Amino acid sequence: MTHQTHAYHMVNPSPWPLTGAFSALLLTSGLVMWFHYNSITLLTLGLLTNILTMYQWWRDVIREGTYQGHHTPIVQKGLRYGMILFIVSEVFFFAGFFWAFYHSSLVPTHDLGGCWPPTGISPLNPLEVPLLNTSVLLASGVSITWAHHSLMEGKRNHMNQALLITIMLGLYFTILQASEYFETSFSISDGIYGSTFFMATGFHGLHVIIGSTFLIVCLLRQLKFHFTSKHHFGFEAAAWYWHFVDVVWLFLYVSIYWWGS
């Protein structure tokens, strides 16, 4: 490798963007095949190639940042800006769902019976499973903060315990959300209420699954002594993402579950 006189990371040629694009093609084509022809062959192949690409790409990034020293302070600064912009883009994603919900609920049309929830819809009780889900996510926000402080203070065992608790709470939230979906009396095809409810809460649920995966990777890296109090952007990004998921859920709970019911 040629000598460089700057602190920026010049990425080496990698096949993973190509395999990632190919897996995205397989995933979208597989979804079409599944929806229209009830065949999951392409979808399964797309999921496998996507998982393989993610694993190998992340492995390369971890090796470059942890063992080869490519993630200098100026590179970490750029990564932080990138993560902030990514979270901002996600905020606007959810803003679209909230806009659709409030646009439909504040001035319900005659087609909906002139009321909200629409005639024939039995909304979920916000004081049952949704309130438990809120408590679970708020507790996970506390535990991820505990993990961060433990890392900064060099308390490895506390960090491991707090991170494991956060992951377990995230998985528990996902199970509760799935059980709630099975108990609803309406579906995503039941007009604007069903579509906005399942789209907003389902998209948030997907983010919880992604965040839980992110934290599991961080726990495995922590067990391999990858993080120090000075060099831990991977965990920091996961913590930011998890707090974002917490805040979005609070807005979902107040808007869709409590006020919308």
From Swiss-Prot:
GO terms for molecular function: cytochrome-c oxidase activity. Its EC number is 7.1.1.9. Component of the cytochrome c oxidase, the last enzyme in the mitochondrial electron transport chain which drives oxidative phosphorylation. The respiratory chain contains 3 multisubunit complexes succinate dehydrogenase (complex II, CII), ubiquinol-cytochrome c oxidoreductase (cytochrome b-c1 complex, complex III, CIII) and cytochrome c oxidase (complex IV, CIV), that cooperate to transfer electrons derived from NADH and succinate to molecular oxygen, creating an electrochemical gradient over the inner membrane that drives transmembrane transport and the ATP synthase. This is Cytochrome c oxidase subunit 3. It comes from the Eukaryota. Component of the cytochrome c oxidase (complex IV, CIV), a multisubunit enzyme composed of 14 subunits. The complex is composed of a catalytic core of 3 subunits MT-CO1, MT-CO2 and MT-CO3, encoded in the mitochondrial DNA, and 11 supernumerary subunits COX4I, COX5A, COX5B, COX6A, COX6B, COX6C, COX7A, COX7B, COX7C, COX8 and NDUFA4, which are encoded in the nuclear genome. One of its GO terms (biological process) is respiratory chain complex IV assembly. Its main location: mitochondrion. Belongs to the cytochrome c oxidase subunit 3 family. The gene is mt-Co3. The chain crosses the membrane at residues 16-33, 39-62, 78-99, 130-150, 157-178, 199-224, 233-255. Residues 1-15, 63-77, 151-156, 225-232 are mitochondrial matrix. Pfam families: COX3.
